[in-house]
A protein has these predicted regions:
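Catalytic core of the metallo-beta-lactamase
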Residues: 13-17, 95-108, 138
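Active-site-proximal segments of metal-dependent phosphoesterases and phosphodiesterases across multiple
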Residues: 39, 44, 112-149
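Short, conserved loop/helix-junction motifs that constitute active-site signature segments
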Residues: 53-58, 108-109, 143-149, 167-169
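Active-site neighborhood of phospho(di)ester-bond hydrolases with catalytic His/Asp-centered motifs
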Residues: 7-11, 32-37, 61-67, 82-84, ...
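Binuclear metal-dependent phosphoesterase catalytic core
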Residues: 2-3, 87-92, 140-146, 160-191
Length: 191
């Protein structure tokens, strides 16, 4: 696409060592993307620390809310990041930040890259190792019917999916959910 290097992680759940670990990559990546579930529990302390951390990035940061971030007003009030509902073009690539439980995914139909917490249903990124599908049926339907322009979906939610990457109707899906390991799981995506 445009010679950009993207960092993608999800489901950090306020992992103690994750924040400094990720910040150390600032010079290695052009854009940082996080697909929700920043919080472990709904506490003012966690929200404050995450907000400070997100504000400390020197590169563009895109985020979407996850089920543990509800209500997401705290996340969406951080001025220096692109959050829920945002559509922003950088170097000709249109990013869209889909809120958790989005009412109308078609608002993001023209985006090249979508950040969404829940992966499309019936993909190896949405099916857990115990064979339960936790994916978004509507998102999968829109992709299958070519109603979204997106070429890349950045998601999480499923901590141990069958696979962290899949392709549905030509759309690359990256599930970068961390599973509580000492170091956060992340994916490096070259555009």
């Amino acid at each position: 696409m445009n010679n950009l290097k993207l960092f993608h992680a999800s489901d950090l759940h306020f992992g103690a060592g994750y924040f400094d670990y990720i910040l150390a990559f600032q010079d290695k990546f052009d854009i940082f993307c996080f697909s929700g579930d920043f919080l472990y529990k709904d506490s003012a302390h966690e929200k404050e620390q995450i907000a400070l951390w997100l504000k400390s990035f020197k590169k563009p940061v895109f985020v979407c809310s996850g089920n543990h971030d509800m209500p997401p007003s705290w996340l969406n009030s951080i001025n220096s990041i692109y959050s829920d509902g945002t559509i922003k073009t950088i170097k000709g690539i249109k990013f869209g930040c889909v809120p958790y439980l989005c009412d109308d995914l078609l608002e993001f139909a023209e985006c090249d890259i979508l950040l969404t917490h829940v992966p499309p249903a019936k993909t190896s990124t949405s099916i857990s190792k115990n064979d339960k599908d936790h994916g978004d049926i509507e998102l999968a339907r829109l992709i299958k019917n070519n109603l979204l322009k997106a070429k890349i979906i950045l998601c999480g939610h499923i901590h141990e999916p069958k696979s962290n990457m899949d392709i549905l109707n030509g759309v690359k899906i990256y599930n970068s959910a961390s599973s509580g390991a000492k170091e956060p799981f992340y994916q490096e995506i070259e555009l």
